[in-house]
Structure formats: C-alpha cells, structure tokens
Amino acid sequence: MSENPFDLTGKVAIVTGTSRGLGQYFGRALARAGADLVITSRDPATLAPFQAEIEALGRRALPLPLDVRSSDSIQAMVKAAISHYGKIDVLVNNAGCNVRKPALEVTWDDWNLVLDTNLRGTFFVSQAVARHMIPRKYGRIINIGSVTCVAGYAGLGPYGASRGGVKQLTMSLADDWGVHGITVNCLAPGWFKTQQNAVMYENREWVEYLCDRIPLKRPGQPQDLNGAVVFLASDASAYVTGQTLLVDGGISTGATRALPKKVR
C-alpha cells in the first residue's frame, strides 16, 4: 500500500456518464491520482476527446457503450471492462438525467425516465460491479447524488425523489456489502454550473438569489469536487461507508435562508 492514502496508482475506476459535465471532472481527478479508467456513454464515439485527454495524463482510458436503463448493456460493459483490465476497484455511478417541470406537468414517461436512469441504473450497475468486487474483498462504490436528496426544490420532483432514493440505496448497499470489504458512499453536489444547466446561470438575478442562500456565497466549481471523489475512491476513506458527503457550499444548512438579507 502506498504511504499516500489518496494514491490511486494501480487502481481501475469505472466512471459512468463521461461524455460531458461532472463525469469528466470525476474522471480527470481519479486519473491525476493515478487510476486507469473505464469511461462510458450511450454513444462511445463522443468519448474520443476525453479518452485522448486522459491518455495525455499518462493513464489508460477504455471507452465503452453503456445505457444504464438496459440490463444487457450493463452486463456487457462490466464484462468488457474486466476483460480489458482484469479487475474493477472503483465505480463512480455518475450517469443521470433530469426533467425540470412543475409537478402538475410531469408525465408518466418523465417520471420513468428519471427514476430508471438515476435510481434503477445506479442499483443495477452497482450490482453488476459488486459481483466482481466481492470475491476480491475490495471495492469503492461512489454514487453521485445531489443536494436535492436532503432539500426540496420546486420543479425537481422526479429528480429529487431519485436522488433521495440514491441516498437511501447507498446506506442499504453499504450494510449489505461491507462484510466483503466494499465501501459504498454518496457524493452529493450542490449547485454547480454544467453544460446541462448553463442557461440558468445566464440569469444574473437568479445567480444572486442562489448565492445569497449559499454560506460560501458562490456556486460550486467542478474542481471543488476533486478532493471528495478522490477521498471516497481511495484508502483514505477505508473506514467510511454508507455516508452522503454534501459538497454544496453549505446551502443544505438552510441557515442563511432563514435570515433577512440586511442581517447577513
């Protein structure tokens, strides 16, 4: 074992949903810590630039197709990853989606899309990877959640429900697989600007409203997540499992939200 508990040299990490957004930041952070990667997307052709970026860091990156709503796709991805690397040490369940609508406008299909992707997908990818981790008595599973797992936001009903489910699932899987040396934790970002929500951050009034409610007075930057994902993927977190780590600038405290602005 390295003297540096955050060192991931020799580890293999799967990061789902790496065609854009936070998934790529998670992948970069793990690669810089020494891990080789499996990167996934429903269309693996979109992964070529990211693959090249990881390889430029001196790490390996295997691009694979993955639709987390398909059992066959999940099984094929895990089989290909093990065939290529021989093992899986770390899983980052990042693939997800959102439908932002008032509750009365949410359709049956909207609900199924979000829950099938964010919750069911997280479970069945974890299950498939755990089948390989259990005989090796080692594994780090990181489920990507959201501040919506602890706070309610209008227009995010299905999304919040899915992330709340991921938080609960994390605790259940941690209890189930801890005996096998597998830790399962949830990394829950707060409000971060990504390609998916960039249009929201063009509204200055909304950004001011948001920052007024964040104790650190700014939205998150993707690099703010680097330390958390490396911590949860590494031996530094060997005795941490079943936990949800909120990286949200403190917005989940609700404290500044309750005070008049002039008091703050």
Predicted regions and their residues:
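Active-site helix of classical SDR
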Residues: S126, S162, T170
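Conserved glycine-rich cofactor-binding loop
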Residues: V12, S19-G21
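Residue(s) in the substrate-gating loop at a strand-loop-helix junction
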Residues: S146
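Substrate-binding pocket helix/loop in short-chain dehydrogenase/reductase
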Residues: P102-A103, T107-L115, I141, L210
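Short, small/polar-rich loop/turn modules that mediate ligand/substrate recognition or access, typified
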Residues: G178, T183, V240-G242
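Alpha-helical segment proximal to the catalytic Tyr-Lys
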Residues: R131, D175-D176, A238
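C-terminal substrate-recognition "lid" of short-chain dehydrogenase/reductases
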Residues: F123-S126, Y138, R218-V247, S252
